[in-house]
Amino acid sequence: ITRDPKELAEAVREVLEQGSINLYMFHGGTNFGFMNGCSARGTLDLPQVTSYDYDALLDEEGNPTAKYLAVKKMMATHFPEYPQLEPLYKESMELDAIPLVEKVSLFETLDSLSSPVESLYPKKMEELGQSYGYLLYRTETNWDAEEERLRIIDGRDRAQLYVDGQWVKTQYQTEIGEDIFYQGKKKALSRLDILVENMGRVNYGHKFLAD
């Protein structure tokens, strides 16, 4: 979400000549954890990034931007009775690349992360007292043919399919429900895992109070 600095400064001037104003956002910031939010666009949901900079007058580090300087210049010209102070700039440093030297497998650490819930049917995240993050659905199945056609129904927002711990397919909300073809061994018992991720909850608009 961006706006031309000069155009914004002129809009702020017009408002201040009539009254007061509250700039949103004035200071960029960051949402933490899974609280990033999501925009609703018709039938499509667009998860937002964790950054909450939003092209604000001050960036996420608190440093002034071109937009801040444009509004500051406008204020000095049209409202000279208000004193102007020079903004402060925080020092920053460039970090070198950090090599990844260790990793763990999700499937090898499940017992340490959570406890299983057994059910005859797949339960929704909310039915399990969870509103954000990930759910792993697991079952065992026999393949009736060497090539099986699978479908994930009504999942959101991203689903990753694994067979015996091996990744098979990743689908996003617009792809979920499409056929997934898997080459397996006929009658062989396999473990089927579907990792579902909630990528962000709608935080405004017509879907805000929807089921």
Where would I find each of the regions flagged by the language model?
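Catalytic-core regions of glycoside hydrolase
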Residues: 1-21
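Carbohydrate-binding surfaces of carbohydrate-active enzymes
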Residues: 14-19, 23-211
